[in-house]
Amino acid sequence: MGGINVIEIEIVPDHESASARVAGFIVEQIRRKPASVLGLATGGTPERTYELLVEKVNAGHLSFSQATTFNLDEYVGLLPDHPQSYHAYMRFRLFGETDFDAERTHLPKGTADELSDAGGQYEALIAEAGGIDLQLLGLGANGHIGFNEPGATEDSRTRVVDLTEETIAANARFFDSPEDVPRRALTMGIATILEAREIVLIATGESKAEAVERSVRGPVAPQMPASFLQQHPSVTFVLDEAAASLLDKRA
């Protein structure tokens, strides 16, 4: 890695189409390798993707029983049963609704006694599982992937980070008030993400258009964390027309 690669761009009409396409990537991966290691994301964007996967499992068309998962991040200080924790998000939207083996679903421990050790322990678990086959990403309006905020470095690993005011404001809709949003999170690093064998990023809506354009066409720089994806040999951005609106579609 380190060279610049062409990010594959798929543009679809709307969020529903994007969600279906990303669900298709995951279905294809599991059918190709039932014991796949999946990297998973949270937030509003992938919710419909997870709903579609639940429908496929419940219809008998898909099984996650042999799969292993690693989520990108978790808030620091929220217990796993806190309704806004990402443990609860995944349990409610995917894990508890399908046939995933709970022993093989992993999220960073934001309540670990020794947070300084939690990142290294998470990295070790990923390595022990053989690395991530397919990593799902969302995209923040400021270009963050996971909770790697602007300024994140290419060599960063799973660690505790401070959230920007922009990210706190964006996530406030999930909490009773902005004051309730945690100020720190435990997140996979840029280097961790780039070690996945394949990466699929979903971005929808006009609010993501500038970050998409800078990630795909702009220089690779810490101030636009998703731009580091240009250095990965197998990345696909699945975009709706609004998120792709600033791209030259002939490129």
Swiss-Prot record:
One of its GO terms (biological process) is glucosamine catabolic process. Catalyzes the reversible isomerization-deamination of glucosamine 6-phosphate (GlcN6P) to form fructose 6-phosphate (Fru6P) and ammonium ion. This is Glucosamine-6-phosphate deaminase. The keyword Ion transport does not apply. Belongs to the glucosamine/galactosamine-6-phosphate isomerase family. NagB subfamily. One of its GO terms (molecular function) is identical protein binding. Pathway: Amino-sugar metabolism; N-acetylneuraminate degradation; D-fructose 6-phosphate from N-acetylneuraminate: step 5/5. The active site is at residues 73, 142, 144, 149. Gene3D superfamilies: 3.40.50.1360. Its EC number is 3.5.99.6. The keyword Amino-acid biosynthesis does not apply. Keywords: Carbohydrate metabolism, Hydrolase. It holds the Pfam family Glucosamine_iso. One of its GO terms (cellular component) is cytoplasm. It catalyses: alpha-D-glucosamine 6-phosphate + H2O = beta-D-fructose 6-phosphate + NH4(+).
